[in-house]
Amino acid sequence: MDVTAGEGNEGDTFWDPSNCTGTPYCPPRCPRFVDKFGEGLVIRPYEERDWDALNEMYRDYAREHRSMGLPPVGDVYIADWLTGLVDHGRNFVAVDGDRIVGHITYVPREGPEPELAVFVHQDSHNRGIGTELCRHVIADAAAAGLDALILHVAKENRRAIHVYLGLGFEVVESESTDTKMRLDLDQSVLAKTRTTPDVGERPGVRGVGQ
């Protein structure tokens, strides 16, 4: 299944967006992303053609990196779970060459405070992909006029909690194994996560490399 990040010469699937000024027709956050090692990826909305590649990412997801029972294990359980997310949620994927290496969703897509969940394949950890996926969803949800995003994270996952706090989430409830966090989606949040100009604006790209 071809899920390449972009088009161009053979073997060239990425262009550097650092000098792009954007257009009024760009999405809330630029899909082009350079990771911590200078490698280019694309983060874009999920498409039907991504089904097989996304299933493959989860089939190869290491069990020791699962948290709070997710992602599920086994082809049937993975497919059922993904069907629900695709049918009822708003989904984005991180594409590295011809592979999907990350996935984020918020469900339900029409809810005023939908729940966010993000997963990055273990071979692509420590590249900043999970954080960038979160920024995409935050920008998308804020632009859609949603009130807030919530998430649940294992209490012992201090690294993830630290990332979410850095993105503006606040702890609203903490139990023995589960921490609930919430992000208010006001205009200041949209300004911080947006990397394309609003209609009528002509600034350079804002936030690239954050």
Set out the residue ranges of the language-model regions.
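Conserved GNAT acetyl-CoA-binding A-motif
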Residues: 141-154
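C-terminal "cap" of GNAT-fold acetyltransferases
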Residues: 154-157, 174-210
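Conserved active-site alpha-helix within GNAT-family acetyltransferase domains
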Residues: 131, 155-175
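Hydrophobic adenine-recognition pocket in adenosine-nucleotide-binding enzymes
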Residues: 46, 120, 153
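Acyl-donor-binding surface of acyltransferase catalytic domains
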Residues: 1-37, 185
